[in-house]
Amino acid sequence: MKIINSFKKTFLFTFCLLFFSAHTHSITLEKTPVSLNNPWGMSWADDQLLITQKSGEIFLVNTNDYTKIKIDHKIPFVQHGQGGLLDIVSDKNIVWVTGSIKKNGKYTTAIYRAELKNNILINEKLIY
């Protein structure tokens, strides 16, 4: 019985080595000419990236020519300690942004939903 169990383990191990071998991938890093200070989160929007900076700015960066446009918003994020403007997620023209806000004298994390129109976040709404 021990011989059969040992054989099964050896067979399974050999099978895994043969059919699930590791493949190497080549990765090339490219330094871009976009200047950012403390970038934190990013989200793809077609051929562009929405990038947040911890200090509160949001930029739309074209990934073809690396032009950068500042997105105007009125979301009251505050940079304090490790907090600030954090992650961003987009789906078409809808954007969700997380970050630190001050509420009742204390710092907490909040999520806002907004629409991106003409490089401005509009209809900003606190959802959490």
What are these regions (language model features)?
Residues 19-21:
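N-terminal signal peptide c-region/cleavage motif recognized by signal peptidases
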